[in-house]
Amino acid sequence: MKVAIVHYWLNGMRGGEKVLESLCRLYPQADIYTHVYEPEKVSDLINSHTVHTSFISKLPFGKKKYQSYLPFMPIALEQLDLTGYDLVISSESGPAKGVITNPEAVHVCYCHSPMRYVWDMYYEYFKGAGKLKRLIAAPLIHYLKMWDYSTGARVDHFIANSSYIAKRIEKIYRRDAEVINPPVEFDAFSISEDVDDYYLVLGQMVQYKRVDLAVEAFIANGKKLVIVGDGEKADELREMAKGHSNIDIRGRQPFSEIVRLYSGCQALIFPGVEDFGIVPLEAMASGRPVIAYGRGGVLDSVVDGKTGIYFNEQTAESLNQAVAAYVAGQYDFKPEALRAHAMSFATSEFEKKLKAYIDSVMP
């Protein structure tokens, strides 16, 4: 069986590339197709496969400014020659599923998320743009929406990385999706006997992560909050935390320190809405519970009352009610049980489920 894997771009190792690595292990002879490829920025496993790029990589500054060429990516995808492949697996977050396959080929799309900058986060991405940029972007985004919707029909079977994304696939493409949560690597994480008095926020300091909500809540409750990460909201958050010694914003940290902070925290605070969210599972693998806003992909990974606590409104007051319930001992979180739950999302489990599903849809 001849297999092709289509991935949006290869210029780093993020969650999508971890899924790609699993696909590479499951299909060691597969060819990879992508828009942009920087071998030095991806793993040896990915580099061991034959990688073909679209014409985007050949355009001026294509490797660095590839997102500026987004309007050309539909044409670039449709020019990729996938004749001769029996199975095509597209890995979609940026444009990937719009390839044209043989009528006899099976096309499975693993969807991390429909393109957020085209659909639900369009206004978030462009609200700070000038009038001219918004004027130019509007017709281009409209065109991309129409193209993206139409290419949903080119996919034979959708897989969503969470129940939340499955609902978005149904909403946007009017298609059902099998839910297979993405792989998480837990080898580095362990339970510690030394738990400190701080709560932890970890991730990019961008608007949708709602780190500001955690800062506001912990200014009010006076408990120690350690924040690890960086991003466009960093200066704003530091200004917000001025004069509050219990808010400790540390910026980027080495992985070894992140591992230590996970295992030593009282609980992870997760105030945003994400497509899935690896961070809560890493905290649970370290034996620590999660206090999360009860919406989005976290509903697949955190079990309310057993591995964490949900707060139901995205407000500081609602978050602090959940923190108060944790402090009052209303929940009996067992570190070993938290870790055991996290391990059900391990890479080996993901690969078993993914292979079984793909095998089931092949003729």
Residue ranges and their predicted role:
Residues 263-275, 288:
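Acidic donor-binding loop of glycosyltransferase active sites
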Residues 269, 289-294, 302:
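Short hydrophobic beta-strand element within catalytic cores of glycosyltransferases
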Residues 130-158, 166:
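Membrane-proximal helix-turn-helix segments that form the acceptor-binding/catalytic region
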Residues 304-305, 309-316, 324-331:
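Conserved acidic donor-binding segment of nucleotide-sugar-dependent glycosyltransferases
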Residues 235-259:
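Nucleotide-activated donor-binding/catalytic signature segment of Leloir-type glycosyltransferases, i.e.
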Residues 184-186, 190-226:
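Conserved donor-binding/catalytic core segment of Leloir-type glycosyltransferases
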Residues 29-97:
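Active-site donor-binding segments of glycosyltransferases and PAPS-dependent sulfotransferases
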Residues 314-317, 331-361:
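A charged, aromatic-enriched C-terminal amphipathic alpha-helix characteristic of glycosyltransferases
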